[in-house]
Amino acid sequence: MPHLPPLGLPARRRLAGALCALFATATAHAGGWETVSASRTYNTIPVESDDTVNPLRGYHRWQNQELVPQAAPALDAFRRYHWRDLESVQGQYTFGAILADLKAARDQGRKYAFRLRMMAGYDDGQLYAPAYLAGNASCLHGCGFWADSGAASGKTWVPDWNDPFVLARSRALLQALAQAIAASGNGASIAWIDVGLYGQYGEWAMRKSVYANRPAGIEEAGTDTRRAIAQMHFEAFPDQQFVMFIPYANRDALHYALLEQTITSKPVGLRADCLAQAGYFRQWTDHPDDWRQFADQWRKAPFVAEFCPFDSGQAGPATARAQASEFHISSVGNANFALSKPDNQRWLSLSEPEQHDMLMLGREAGYRYGVDSTWVSLTADGQLTLAATFRNSGNAPTYEPWKVRLEIVDAGGVARWSASVPVGLNSLAGGAVTTSVQSSWRVPALAAGSYALRLIARDTRPADGQQRHPLAWVLSERDADGGLTLLNLRSR
């Protein structure tokens, strides 16, 4: 603070001294900041009208389809592949379809999820495993058998899941795919991988009827086999996000994947293949002690799902919406319903209440991050303080490495200064939970002009073209890129 002249001096000398003092003050502040002390509150978009599209929440693109109307294309896409299309001759792999889909997702600003399958239909007479596998002499009992599982005229080829050769070739397939994806340079564009291969559609479920007349020596998949199939996925892709199918019969494999193994760098999530089927989750709620082991896995790894075809009664959108809410499901495939209709008629075939439930499911599933309030203080010499309260009004957290940044942005949109705000979005599990933080920084002098002070959540992964776009706050005041301008600053 400048020293003013003593009051006892003559008036002319006191005036001259005061002018000198004021000049000294202005000089001290030259190149500094205009002082600020401002508080502000923000408006969370009501869930009923929230059409925000964010990664790994709401609806994801399913088999190149997005049937429930959304405000923007999904930021995650999922597809599944038959083993026979990836390895027609033993040891000769054709991963072109997967690599092309993965690259397309990257080029479109999405991330990609997939599953490999050894079976894909009952009684259709199709062999979905490689032709070389059926009847291969390296297997103890022919690697599998043709079963008649129902009234349809065709038969179903059932692999001998326990056979060492079948397991070895499955492991080789996954290892070769991992190498091909690594060589493509697009591995960071994977959203998640289903632990697949085993079971019908690779979904870890089998009709017991197919084993009624099985050949001697062939048995249902044992617990060691199921663990081995999960393990080979993890060993091939140890740093990717996995999700695991939830049939109750696989509880031992789930225990291994979620609670025992230490191969994967990320916790393994859950996968439901029959959302909307009334009573589907009773397989777990009827066994509460068993479910208790996995019930909170959603807090640290994603729970994703796809629909069972809608039937009459309780099997439909209302049931799916309730299940997604109760079990904290983050992302649902945006297709695979009303299968009796052509693709362009499926959405229109739903009643108005059913359409409402489908829209609300997408709005409610997963995280909904916002900012309740902020207080900003900036001194002339660049001491910047932020106090902020963050909220997750969704039903689950994010599972990706977002970092909230405070940025000073010039008129051209270039961040001239930024700092990390000490808030972990992953720790805000949902249910309107909030957390408040306060931090201070010393901001350097910047060129004279006006700047925007912004809060933005950015993907912390390497900037190699595979980063997510900034997370969009669910706030009425948010900017076009999803960030939030708190106020304008002025450097002198």
Regions inferred by a protein language model and the residue ranges of each:
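Active-site groove signature of glycoside hydrolases
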Residues: 144-166, 173-215
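Substrate-binding cleft of secreted/luminal carbohydrate-active enzymes
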Residues: 249-250, 260-372
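Bacterial N-terminal signal peptides
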Residues: 17-26
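Extracellular/luminal regions of secreted and cell-surface proteins that mediate adhesion/ECM remodeling
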Residues: 359-492
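Bacterial N-terminal signal peptides that target proteins for export
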Residues: 3-16
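Boundary at the C-terminal end of the N-terminal hydrophobic targeting segment
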Residues: 28-30
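N-terminal substrate-binding region of glycoside hydrolase catalytic domains
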Residues: 32-165, 293-349
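Substrate-binding cleft/loops of secretory-pathway carbohydrate-active enzymes
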Residues: 194-236, 243-298
